[in-house]
């Protein structure tokens, strides 16, 4: 069920860490993303919810520079005329993709340190404090720090992917479906960690099909459908909106509610 497309005021933040304006992506004659605009404020968690095929991953890929796009992307106060992956990473944009890109033949600790090295280009000693911070967030990773990443469970690999992104101390962390395919216990743990990051002032753009869990942790939310922003507003307000309840929080999402705890 689609949500009615309504024009609503933008996310009002004085100095957004990310501002996307009229972003569009086309595959041939098919427009996968159409004039999408959003903002993420400093220390804010913003979520984008929507069904499969809505264009959520396309949106993140275009912001990151993985896909060619039309529109405007301003990150950390600077306009990126043509976003490029290497430039965005160097400037502090972190992405945890839906398909976790880990090095199975490397230890958990070395995978984490690689995340810091990709941005800061320095040695292990320079990142010891950051490594301890990540281990505090993810005790499981500390317990398994000397194991090969290939031996981890799916949930542990997701924790490692998030931890590796945090090692780079990103100015904005983008999470693409972090709970996808995870067991209920691990899903609750992932969202607990997201809530903790919010308390620590980490800016996050969260793309998530589990609308109920996403709206619980977010400050502001966008509903993306068929490549367009259909609705937006404070997350608590959208969670109470009858149209969102019917489309995303009704009986069809009871399973998601169980996963979110």
Predicted regions and their residues:
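Glycine-rich phosphate-binding loops of nucleotide-dependent enzymes
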Residues: 2-261
